[in-house]
Amino acid sequence: FIIYKGIGVINWKFLTSPPSDGMTGGGIWPAIVGTFYLMIGSALFAFPVGVMSGIYMNEYAPKGKLVRFIRVMTNNLSGIPSIVFGLFGMALFVKYLGFGDSILAGSLTLGLLCVPLVIRTTEEALKAIPDSYREGSLALGATKLQTIRYVILPMGMPNIITGLILAMGRVSGETAPILFTCAAYFLPQLPTSILAQCMALPYHLYVIST
């Protein structure tokens, strides 16, 4: 239904031109670029933090109550409404750290939103690798770090990448976090700095629909 009703107005000009006439005309190019910037920024934050945390939890952390508690808290973070992350991002990044409404603040907030998913995906990917590979690598004289870097991570990377793609899919559709941290109502020019505001497709759709 959406494709049937919308295909008549979707063309190259609509996709590559800025909005005009107070959002009643023009296209969505700045919103596309802004969404892309936010996805890249959140990935640059969430991927290293989430993957390294997942590696530590699965490969280094001693099994016990503390690890179980951290896993429970990580799962709970996945269930927190996105608007709570938005308010937290506004308080921490926009106000306390002084980033203001910016791509940087929005990217970090969205990164926090998807870190739990990346952690859990990384853990599950590493758990699926049989211990025989670890034992064989160690028996050949490799250190634990070398085993993780050259044996475990390459085997688990496809599933880890899948988790990152799922996280980016969630990030690309979130409105509440960027509402408080970076989204601009009408900004036909493309942002030139990570400390500038940007338009974004989820917020743009919200504005148009309301």
Which residue ranges define each predicted feature?
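N-terminal, non-cleaved signal-anchor transmembrane helix
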Residues: 1-29, 33
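Transmembrane helix-loop junction
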Residues: 5, 17, 54-59, 91-95, ...
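Interhelical loop and adjacent transmembrane-helix boundary motif
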Residues: 20-22, 26, 178-210
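Transmembrane alpha-helix signature in integral membrane proteins
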Residues: 28-55
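Residue-level signal for discrete positions within transmembrane alpha-helices
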Residues: 31, 35, 72-75, 79, ...
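Transmembrane alpha-helices
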Residues: 43, 144-182
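Membrane-cytosol interface at the C-terminal ends of specific transmembrane alpha-helices
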Residues: 51-71, 102-152, 163-167
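Generic hydrophobic transmembrane alpha-helix motif, especially the helices
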Residues: 75-112
